[in-house]
């Protein structure tokens, strides 16, 4: 029940203009908004004029959804979100989509994780929409195979999750979205070559891949400014990202039995070479481990123009050779952030096995001054019990500070490494490190325990 201060016998909220009430109801699911119609005559039809609809019909009768939409009287929809199943509901789902399009929805979000239905294809009218500016599709059942010309002439943000689409289908989508600025492809399958050379307005690209959703293996994006590429067993070739200024990488290259020095040079380090104009770079733990192998194999690193570098890693010995060499080849670095998140890593056993097979002495590779740092299993154990020593973190910081000459600021975001006493000890050590290296050193606690899978909210 809505309560509030009374104004001449009328509650304060009910006295607000319709536009404000619509804004309030836009922030709740439509089912909850409809319930406000029972409050009073004033509220009876307010929900039906709200320009934002959020419908969850996974358990609802399709007829009740149709009835709800029939009461809707706003001339235009700013946002339409549909969370549904597809089994025995395809006609109803298509009807909802047609309703949103006919009301010129600017933001359209469709979510369905119903794996009982395979190969669902959107109707042709879905691909002809001049109003939508933001489109989000999350479904393990959707095959994006437009059988007609795509015309999304106002679309600026496109996010596809768990969808299947071919290279041919993707070209149709891109050619029909001339104003596209932001593209997210999260665990999408079958497309292999992502050619964005004709998408002149595209500035931001985010791709998450996995063992089951491999693509793409090639990216051509000369107009791109910001790239986030995460998690894959297959390497991804950056053919043209010449306008890139910001990148976030953590690529898992899979079975080390197939990894050679040539592979490292032509994939891991070559990816760095394509980032030579990037000024803001984030690198994850497994990518750092692969850089360590490249460094130990004597693979030359490119010189980078990075000014702000973020490392998302546990404090383990197997990332140190890669980090220190990377720092030496980043002469203009001004700010280094170390975020000690828990993340996936290649085991020490596999790394050492790789070194032996390539006639490299593991004791020499993990230098004596790096041997004080733990392996991945030891670090995970420390994270669980929070008994890492403050001097271990300080040694890690000192090791990195000695590898860079131009640094102005180091920020350490700690997750679960130290208890309260250890944290206070580290703060004191950081003051000494700051003075000795003429670098501003900041120590902060972080409550993000795992590497994020998405960009920060825009």
UniProtKB/Swiss-Prot annotation:
Top-rank taxon: Eukaryota
Whether Repeat counts among this entry's keywords is yes
SUPFAM superfamilies named among the record's database cross-references: F-box domain, RNI-like
Q: Per UniProt, which keywords does this protein have?
A: Leucine-rich repeat, Repeat
User: InterPro entries per the record?
Assistant: F-box-like_dom_sf (IPR036047), F-box_AtFBL13-like (IPR053781), F-box_dom (IPR001810), F-box_plant (IPR044997), LRR_At1g61320_AtMIF1 (IPR055357), LRR_dom_sf (IPR032675)
All residue ranges annotated as the F-box domain in the record: 10-56
Query: Key word Repeat present in the record?
Result: yes
Question: Where are LRR repeat segments found?
Answer: 57-84, 86-112, 133-161, 162-187, 226-251, 260-285, 325-353, 389-414
The protein depicted here goes by the name: F-box/LRR-repeat protein At5g02910
Q: From what organism does this protein derive?
A: Arabidopsis thaliana (Mouse-ear cress)
């Amino acid at each position: 029940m809505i309560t509030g201060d009374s104004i001449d016998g009328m509650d304060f909220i009910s006295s607000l203009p319709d536009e404000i009430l619509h804004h309030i109801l836009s922030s709740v699911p439509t089912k909850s908004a409809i319930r406000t119609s029972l409050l009073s005559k004033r509220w009876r039809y307010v929900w039906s004029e709200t320009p934002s609809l959020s419908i969850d019909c996974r358990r609802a009768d399709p007829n009740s959804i149709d009835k709800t939409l029939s009461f809707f009287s706003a001339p235009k929809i700013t946002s339409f979100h549909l969370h549904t199943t597809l089994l025995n509901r395809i006609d109803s789902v298509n009807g909802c989509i047609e309703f949103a399009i006919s009301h010129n929805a600017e933001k359209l979000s469709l979510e369905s994780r119903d794996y009982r239905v395979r190969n669902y294809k959107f109707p042709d009218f879905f691909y002809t929409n001049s109003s939508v500016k933001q489109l989000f599709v999350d479904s393990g059942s959707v095959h994006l195979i437009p059988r007609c010309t795509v015309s999304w002439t106002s679309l600026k943000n496109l996010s596809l999750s768990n969808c299947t689409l071919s290279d041919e289908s993707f070209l149709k989508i891109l050619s029909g979205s001339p104003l596209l600025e932001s593209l997210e492809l999260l665990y999408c399958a079958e497309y292999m070559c992502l050619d964005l050379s004709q998408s002149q307005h595209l500035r931001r690209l985010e791709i998450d891949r996995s063992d089951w959703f491999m693509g793409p293996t090639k990216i051509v994006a000369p107009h791109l400014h910001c790239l986030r590429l995460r998690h894959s067993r297959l390497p991804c070739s950056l053919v043209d990202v010449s306008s890139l200024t910001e990148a976030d990488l953590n690529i898992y290259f899979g079975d080390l039995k197939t990894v050679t020095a040539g592979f490292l040079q032509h994939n891991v380090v070559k990816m760095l070479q394509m980032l030579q104009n990037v000024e803001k770079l984030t690198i994850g733990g497994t990518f750092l481990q692969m850089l360590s192998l490249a460094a130990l194999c004597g693979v030359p690193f490119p010189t980078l123009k990075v000014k702000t570098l973020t490392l998302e890693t546990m404090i383990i010995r197997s990332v140190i050779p890669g980090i220190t060499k990377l720092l030496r080849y980043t002469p203009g670095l001004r700010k280094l952030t170390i975020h000690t998140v828990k993340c996936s890593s290649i085991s020490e056993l596999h790394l050492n096995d790789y070194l032996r097979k390539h006639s490299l002495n593991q004791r020499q590779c993990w230098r004596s001054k790096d041997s004080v740092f733990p392996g991945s299993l030891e670090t995970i154990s420390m994270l669980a019990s929070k008994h890492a020593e403050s001097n271990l973190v300080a040694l890690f910081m000192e090791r990195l500070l000695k590898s860079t000459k131009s640094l102005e600021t180091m920020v350490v975001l700690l997750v679960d490494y130290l208890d309260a006493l250890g944290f206070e000890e580290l703060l004191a050590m950081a003051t000494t490190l700051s003075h000795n290296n003429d670098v501003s050193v900041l120590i902060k606690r972080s409550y993000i325990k795992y590497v994020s899978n998405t960009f920060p909210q825009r």
